[in-house]
Amino acid sequence: MYIEGVGEVEVIRKRISRMYIHVGRGRHVFVTAPRTCSEDLIRRFLTEKKDWILATLEKTPEAVEYEYTDGEEHILLGKKVTLHVAGGASNACTLNGRDVMITVRSSRTSVRKIYEEWSRDMLRRIVVMYIKKWAETMGVFPGDITIRKMKGRWGSCNVKTGELCFALDLITKDG
């Protein structure tokens, strides 16, 4: 559905009694509405809430699609870093000040994969450091620790197994 001044809004119909507006990643706007709600009523609702939608869109950053090329800027631990990609004898990734040096063995090797594995290892070391500090204080000791890509949360825990799972995106935050 197109709303003047806002743009395209995705309408999701569910078995609910009220309408909800959400601005998601990449500045994607959608409204969840009752199945019985008419298009006209949804359009009026969105028009009434237009100021809120525009204010929220202004605060929401655009989705960043990285290409993992030489000279590209990324966020690492809350600071901008520059990728420097070069060929070499083995796949490696190192941090040198504000520069991330990525060495790729062959052209078929994915720079993204090397960078993500390195980021995952770095985040694991940071998380383990914090867990050691707080586990003793709280008297609770976790089982397994995993790092994975998560869209909707920063982490989770499994009470039965003691597993702690953290979002890979935490590596972009200032710790």
Named regions from a protein language model:
Residues M1-G175:
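Active-site-proximal or metal-binding-adjacent scaffold patches in catalytic folds
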